């Protein structure tokens, strides 16, 4: 069950029109949880979004910003094959670079959807027993 760890450092005066982008390789599976650590000192001046291709997946709209907090997103986002996510950030701070730390929990489908796979296994057992 891969825990993907990544971070992005955004230089001071990085405009939204020309953001910093960091690509993160992720295995096929289901993204079930995302943690974003915003260190103290950001003063809500640095901003982050996570994209899959052109689609923004975290957050669904707006952007992540804050100061000295950890955000946790319970997610269900399927990646049918090994793929790449993009951390995209900009920084309105005129003096300091700012960094976001990101963790992604990617589960194989049987672990992400245990109820579905349990029912399928039960159906197979009943079928073998001649019970439908």
What does each of the following model-derived ranges do?
Residues 1-29, 35-132:
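Beta-strand-centric surfaces of beta-sandwich/beta-rich domains
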């Amino acid at each position: 069950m891969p825990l993907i760890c990544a971070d992005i450092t955004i230089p001071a005066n990085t405009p939204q029109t020309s953001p910093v982008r960091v690509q993160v390789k992720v295995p096929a599976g289901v993204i079930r949880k995302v943690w974003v650590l915003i260190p103290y000192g950001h003063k809500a001046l640095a901003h982050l979004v996570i994209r899959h291709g052109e689609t923004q997946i975290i957050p669904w709209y707006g952007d992540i910003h804050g100061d000295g907090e950890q955000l946790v997103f319970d997610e269900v986002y399927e990646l049918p094959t090994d793929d790449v996510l993009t951390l995209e950030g900009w920084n309105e701070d005129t003096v300091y670079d700012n960094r976001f730390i990101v963790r992604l929990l990617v589960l194989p489908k049987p672990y992400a959807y245990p109820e579905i796979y349990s029912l399928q296994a039960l159906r197979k057992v009943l079928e073998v027993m001649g019970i439908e």
